[in-house]
Amino acid sequence: ITETGITQMTYQQEPNQIIWGVRDDGELIGLTYQREQQVTAWHRHIFGGRFGNATITVTDYANIADGTRIVLTKADGTTTTFTSATSSTTGKFHTTSSNNQTATNLKTLIDADSNFTATVLSNVVTITETSPLSTGFLTIKSLDDATRLAKTDEGKAVCESVSVIPTDDSEYQTWVIIKRTINGATRRFVEFINNFDFTETDNTTFNFLDSALAYSGSAVTTISGLDHLEGQTVGILANGATHPDKTVASGSITLDRSSTNVKVGLAYKSILQTMRLDAGSQNGTSQGKTKRIYEITIRLFESIGVEVGESLDNMERIPFRTSFDPMDEGIPPFTGDKAVEFRGNYDTDGFIFVRQTQPLPLTILSLYPELQTND
């Protein structure tokens, strides 16, 4: 989990004993170590937001072959392909004048796709999604010529520093410096990691968004003061319920419904991947044997919203809202067991993935899979 190295370390004594480290690739990692409880657990923390731009730099235009392809992959995983041509051809970018002119032609073609917005400066084309998701990145592949059509991608926000500072009470506060690209410019944010209260059940107090601001007062539909997130697609929790993402414009957003308690910030995903399943079989262990998980029970504590599946591309969302819950407000956190059909295939690993994509609490106590093993 330390990959190629750690550039900085610090220790948090309370409320949990965690050794924090900053990796040289800008990820924050932690090692929770509680000897008396026999707890030794590594964890990674990828912050909301993005750093870097998706760009294409055009060079040596005269030798870009006819039919060279560029593939843009949106934050939701869907792709769009653009193709070059050495003569005027509808639906392709032309390579007939110069590096700069070729870049302009490429920009014009990408701009014609409603999913993207492109700008050009000299021979560099910068691309953004028109309506990006609040999580995920825009990436580029130059399938046939990565030299003459060089690219850069959007990437995760970069953690540059971490520090633990004692507070007036018994807990310690963890502070980080996060580097993001905001509205085309590099910005650094000084933020602290919220110490989660596991006993809190008031939906309006939940804070599971990065660089977030809160509003509490009379019912409103406009939330302002968001200049630090200008141009960003933000996650929203309104009156304890999830709300469709919005893009910050002129430092504000407009809600779909009036609300009295609102949290607005950069969304992130929380993902759990189990180790390879080690269960019994008729002939010893199930390790290395073909198996299929067909149902799983997930035991939760004060949680709302969870997906489970065999891979991140095949997840099943577990329902929490019932006919007894009012439709115009958030639902209370759930404690107990949720059983769900597991859409798994036969394989030898038996991995289980659990994911939270909403700004809501998720505490997993245990997972109980039911499976069939072929001996």
For the regions a language model picked out, list residue spans one by one.
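Extended, beta-strand-rich, solvent-exposed assembly scaffolds of outer structural proteins
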Residues: 51-151, 256-257
